[in-house]
From Swiss-Prot:
Pfam families: Mur_ligase, Mur_ligase_C, Mur_ligase_M
Pathway: Cell wall biogenesis; peptidoglycan biosynthesis
Enzyme class: ligase
GO molecular function (one): UDP-N-acetylmuramate-L-alanine ligase activity
Cellular compartment(s): Cytoplasm
Main location: cytoplasm
Protein name: UDP-N-acetylmuramate--L-alanine ligase
UniProt GO cellular component terms: cytoplasm
Lineage summary: Bacteria, Bacillati, Actinomycetota, Actinomycetes, Mycobacteriales
Role this protein plays: Cell wall formation.
Organism of derivation: Corynebacterium efficiens (strain DSM 44549 / YS-314 / AJ 12310 / JCM 11189 / NBRC 100395)
Catalytic activity field: UDP-N-acetyl-alpha-D-muramate + L-alanine + ATP = UDP-N-acetyl-alpha-D-muramoyl-L-alanine + ADP + phosphate + H(+)
Length: 489
């Protein structure tokens, strides 16, 4: 990890003039969210993106001026130069013409995390961190707080199904946001409540070693405001170890988790315990103890990992002082986030009668395992059907690093189709294809490098009442509706 890539973590930051903000890559999940909040605060917002998308239309509708394609003149979309340019250093090359123009004009260039840090100022900050589950947990916390009447501001890495947005400028004191660790961005924030859902090695293309990756969460815990609280998941070894070390260092840390996990970590004070959970027709029913009070929830999204995320969301709202019963009621109304076990439809009649198609963002072995276990629970509860997955690995480095782990996780399905690797910001690596995963798998699997042929491959192996999942962080999401259409005939 290069020191020049780590954000400024001092308590004081240079003043940033946000009167006119230009965002490079404004169509991304993170960038579009901060753009919405800037617009809601009456700021002038311009931006550019490599291609047009459904994200840009609502931003334009509320006043953003957006160009498709990158060019130096895009900095003048508002008729004058911006006061600051915002970029993602991981995704935007340094020779981008808008970045080059900004430097020539001596316009400050900052990261999205710096901008979000500015937007968080003056609020009670709830930051959700962890290798997995950030978006779902953040979304659950937002929905629960809204039900409790707190109207929080929020910035999420995915679109809330019910609200239809990924960001909002609220009237309440709280601001709930994801704290992205992939490039150490989470060290820009000073939370009152810092949630860590789990920690296991990832993003080693940036951090280089697992030790450096774990250290960023230690440093995040040190960023708490005076009187703030670190909230850790005791079911996860990495998060539990962070909590134990935090307690030993005098940091105010509390834990949440299942009964066995809570018992295994006695040095961490417990504020939320999952007493029981089971799959029911409506989703997952769970009973939790929140600081001595028993509450019941029914989550519409399946999986034990979602119950843990729900516990973190409830606990966050409780620590903010929200009414626990209203929080629980709101959580039961949570309908999910786009691309998190997102339901696309069910086939009625014909060869594939009862087969349902879902899409999920899972792109790490642990995430894949959790989603497939949730799908298996749903199939088992129905008493029929199988689990079929179309998986697109994300990043050559991650695929090579975790090939065996991916194979083990994907083998929890009954059959699989593997697409070619979605490289994103990485260049192809000679000899690294999805076959490094398929060669290790123990279930029927086909390697299909032809993207457009995947729906036909799925139709060859799917059957009635099956759950079919498209999975990955890349373009595979576009296949879910195509697969559903193919199965419907």
């Amino acid at each position: 990890m290069r020191t020049d890539q780590v954000p400024n973590t001092t308590s004081e930051h240079p003043a940033i003039d946000l009167s006119r903000v230009h965002l490079i890559g404004i169509g991304g999940a993170g960038m579009s969210g901060v753009a919405r909040i800037l617009l809601a605060r009456g700021k002038t917002v311009t931006g550019s993106d490599a291609k047009d998308s459904r994200t840009l239309l609502p931003l334009r509708a509320v006043g953003a001026k957006i160009a498709v394609g990158h060019a130096a003149e895009n900095l003048e979309l508002a008729g004058e130069l911006p006061t600051v340019v915002v970029t993602s250093f991981a995704a935007i090359p340094q020779d981008n013409p808008e970045l080059v123009r900004a430097r020539e004009e001596n316009i400050p260039v900052i990261r999205r995390s710096d901008l979000l840090g500015e937007l968080l100022e003056g609020h009670r900050q709830v930051l959700i961190a962890g290798t997995h589950g950030k978006t779902s947990t953040t979304s659950m916390a937002v929905v629960a707080l809204q039900a409790a009447g707190m109207d929080p501001s929020f910035a999420i890495g995915g679109q809330l199904n019910k609200a239809g947005t990924n960001a909002h400028q609220g009237t309440g004191e709280a601001f709930v946001a994801e704290a992205d660790e992939s490039d150490a961005s989470l060290l820009r924030y000073t939370p009152e409540i810092a949630v860590v859902t789990n920690i296991e090695p990832d993003h080693l293309d940036f951090f280089k070693t697992p030790e450096a990756y774990f250290q960023v969460f230690e440093d995040f815990a040190d960023r708490l405001t005076p009187g703030g609280t670190l909230v850790v998941c005791l079911d996860d070894p990495g998060a539990a170890a962070l909590g134990e070390r935090a307690v030993a260092r005098g940091i105010n840390a509390v834990g949440y988790g299942t009964v066995d996990a809570v018992a295994a970590h006695p040095t961490v004070p417990v504020k939320a315990t999952i007493l029981s959970s089971r799959v029911v027709a409506e989703g997952t029913y769970a009973v939790l103890d929140i600081d001595g009070r028993e509450v019941e929830i029914i989550l519409q999204i399946p999986g034990n990992h979602m119950v843990l995320n729900g516990a973190a969301a409830l606990l966050s709202g409780y620590l903010l002082g929200a009414d626990l019963d209203k929080l629980a009621a709101g959580l039961s109304d949570f309908s999910g986030v786009r691309r998190r076990f997102e339901y696309h439809g069910t086939v009625r009649g014909g060869q594939f009668d009862g087969a349902s198609v879902y899409d999920d963002y899972a792109h790490h072995p642990t995430e894949v395992e959790a989603v497939l276990k949730a799908a298996r629970e749903r199939v088992d509860a129905a008493g029929e059907g199988r689990v079929i997955v179309a998986f697109q690995p994300h990043l050559y480095s991650r695929t090579l690093e975790f090939a065996r782990e991916f194979a083990g996780a994907l083998s929890l399905a009954d059959a699989a189709v593997l697409l070619e690797i979605f490289g994103a910001r990485e260049k192809p690596v000679e000899g690294v294809t999805s076959r490094v995963i398929t060669d290790e798998m123990t279930i029927p699997v086909s390697y299909e490098p032809n993207f457009s042929a995947v729906p036909d491959r799925i139709a060859e192996i799917a059957g009635p009442a099956d759950i079919v999942l498209t999975m990955g962080a890349g373009s595979v999401t576009m296949l879910a509706p195509e697969i559903l259409d193919r199965l419907r005939g």
